[in-house]
Every structure is written in C-alpha cells, then in structure tokens.
Amino acid sequence: MIRTIQDLLNERVAIGKIVNTHGLKGEVKFFPYTNSEEIVKNLSSVVLYNSEKKAFYNLTVESVRRMNKLFLIRFKSIDTIEAAERIKGCEVFIKYEELPKLSEDEYYFYEILDCDVFYESGENVGKVVDIIETGSNDVLVVRKKKKETLIPMTKDCIVEIDKGAKKIIAKEMEWI
C-alpha cells in the first residue's frame, strides 16, 4: 500500500496528468507524458497523486478514448462532475512493470534523468536534468553547478548508457 510520495516513486512512474473534467458524468481529460498510445489505452489500475493536497487515489479505469492530443478517461468510482473535479490536477501513476519492454537501445526518460554523465576521459560533465525532444533525436541537458551542456543522443555522441548504474559515457565533441 502506498502511504508516502517516496513509496509511490519507488513502485510507480508518472505517465500523465488529469488536466480537466469532461461532461457531467465524471469523465476527465488526460494529458499523457508519453507518446506511446499503447500505454494509455491499456490502463487498468492506477494511482493518482495530488501534490497540493498530498492525497493519493487508487482507481480502476473503466474506459479510455482519444480526443485530439488528449485522452478522455472514465474511472469506475467517478461518476459525477463534482467527483471528477476532485481529481483534476492529479498525476497518474502506473507500475514500472506495466510499461512495455523496450529494445536495448531504447529508454524511458525516467531511466535517463538524474544519470551522471562523463566524457571518455573520465571528466564529470554533470547530471542529466532534462531531455529535449527535437524530432530527429533527443538531446540531453546536462548540468554541473551553473553550467549546462547539451549532448545529442546519437551514436556519434554517446558511447555507453548504463541505466542500472545511472551513468552515461559521452564523446567530447569539438564544436566548430
């Protein structure tokens, strides 16, 4: 049973946020953090967390359907707009093991964020604080003290990713 935010983060990953209500019968608008429609369409049992109220809600998903860039979700125990209003702003969490398995060269953002990044020489570049999606490839935002370094997630720039050790080895690039 999840009692603290630390329990939640140890067992589950946030996949999106409830941004608004939809209609009068308890449906909610869901903004996904993932571009995998499969994850959202297969939701069954989720934990919602409201950071302002420090409240957890264990809910069962009844239905999911797409609406433009959002999804509409109906939960079994939420059947009025008033009940839906109470979960507005909550992040939606699923168990890590419910995420689809990835090939070795793929990753989830949560696996890369907070990784320590080193150049091949051993120099510590910093920690991954953000990932920018550019369309062609992702770019790591690595911060050490107040200095930020951008490192493209390409085979030319990344030598090794050790997700278990939270460590990335990158080539030191000389920019022209």
UniProtKB/Swiss-Prot annotation:
Q: Where's it found, cell-wise? A: Cytoplasm
> What keywords would UniProt list here?
Chaperone, Cytoplasm, Ribosome biogenesis, rRNA processing
Task: Show where the PRC barrel domain sits.
Answer: 104-176
Principal localisation: cytoplasm
Q: Which InterPro entries match?
A: PRC_barrel-like_sf (IPR011033), PRC_RimM (IPR056792), RimM (IPR011961), RimM_N (IPR002676), RimM_N_sf (IPR036976), Transl_B-barrel_sf (IPR009000)
The molecular function terms of the Gene Ontology recorded here are:
ribosome binding
Q: Extract one GO cellular component term from the record.
A: cytoplasm
Instruction: Keyword check for rRNA processing, yes or no.
Output: yes
Q: What's an example GO BP annotation here? A: rRNA processing
Query: What interactions and quaternary structure are annotated?
Result: Binds ribosomal protein uS19.
**What remark about domains does the record contain?**
The PRC barrel domain binds ribosomal protein uS19.
The text of the family note is: Belongs to the RimM family.
State the protein's purpose.
An accessory protein needed during the final step in the assembly of 30S ribosomal subunit, possibly for assembly of the head region. Essential for efficient processing of 16S rRNA. May be needed both before and after RbfA during the maturation of 16S rRNA. It has affinity for free ribosomal 30S subunits but not for 70S ribosomes.
- Give the protein name, as stated in the record: Ribosome maturation factor RimM
Species per Swiss-Prot/TrEMBL record: Thermotoga petrophila (strain ATCC BAA-488 / DSM 13995 / JCM 10881 / RKU-1)
